[in-house]
């Protein structure tokens, strides 16, 4: 995975609560075996009209949000089934960071595992931030190393992140590469450990 230390990008607001994984990536698109190419199906039922044209009423179709890489989402984002296709779709759409008051736990972990940074933010702080970026074409900088958000007004907002996931993102590790880094330690442990087959 690509390391994520500091990211600057346009922020888009999707102020809807309880957005579930079926709304993020509908089930009819889960038959693919690749991890890429899901971006065009993200939010499909909201994003497109029945004739296949983009729905101008859907928030993320607004011109001001074109090219956004930071999503300011509503409470309980990513609830529903545990499908890993949801973060795949959001990542392929172009989002690298998601800021919300709360996330479904499995979705939250799946974001980290797929190189995305989900940031939990107290509701009052989130409400101010969402209001600032609502219907605006504004950038934001997220500094993961120092755990700071720099908004469009130059204000700093601190955030919490689990040290394990922080290290994974900053170094671009996935679970396999992290295991390989610990290969010597694992082998040393195994060499000292008696086989359960031994009497």
UniProtKB/Swiss-Prot annotation:
The keyword Amino-acid biosynthesis applies. Pathway: Amino-acid biosynthesis; L-leucine biosynthesis; L-leucine from 3-methyl-2-oxobutanoate: step 2/4. It catalyses: (2R,3S)-3-isopropylmalate = (2S)-2-isopropylmalate. One of its GO terms (molecular function) is 3-isopropylmalate dehydratase activity. It comes from the Bacteria. It is an enzyme of class 4 (lyase). This is 3-isopropylmalate dehydratase small subunit. GO terms for biological process: L-leucine biosynthetic process. GO terms for cellular component: 3-isopropylmalate dehydratase complex. Belongs to the LeuD family. LeuD type 1 subfamily. InterPro entries: 3-IsopropMal_deHydase_ssu (IPR004431), Aconitase/3IPM_dehydase_swvl (IPR015928), AconitaseA/IPMdHydase_ssu_swvl (IPR000573), IPMI_Swivel (IPR033940), LeuD (IPR050075). Keywords: Amino-acid biosynthesis, Branched-chain amino acid biosynthesis, Leucine biosynthesis, Lyase. Heterodimer of LeuC and LeuD. Its EC number is 4.2.1.33. The keyword Signal does not apply. Catalyzes the isomerization between 2-isopropylmalate and 3-isopropylmalate, via the formation of 2-isopropylmaleate.
């Amino acid at each position: 995975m690509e390391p994520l230390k500091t990211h600057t990008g346009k922020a888009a607001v999707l102020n809807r609560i309880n957005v579930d994984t079926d709304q993020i990536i509908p089930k009819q698109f889960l038959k693919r075996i690749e991890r890429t190419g899901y971006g065009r199906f993200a939010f499909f039922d909201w994003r497109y009209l029945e004739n296949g044209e983009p729905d101008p009423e859907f928030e993320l179709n607004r011109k001001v949000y074109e090219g956004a890489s930071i999503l300011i989402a509503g409470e309980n984002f990513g609830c529903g089934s545990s499908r890993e296709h949801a973060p795949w779709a959001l990542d392929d759409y172009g989002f690298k960071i998601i800021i919300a008051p709360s996330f479904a736990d499995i979705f939250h972990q799946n974001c980290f595992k797929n190189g995305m940074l989900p940031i939990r933010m107290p509701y009052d702080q989130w409400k101010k931030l969402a209001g600032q970026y609502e219907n605006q074409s504004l950038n934001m900088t997220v500094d993961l190393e120092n755990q700071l958000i720099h908004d469009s007004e130059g204000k700093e907002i601190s955030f919490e992140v689990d040290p394990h996931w922080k290290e994974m993102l900053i170094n671009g590790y996935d679970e396999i590469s992290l295991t390989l880094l610990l290969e010597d330690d694992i082998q040393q442990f195994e060499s000292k450990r008696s086989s359960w087959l031994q009497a």
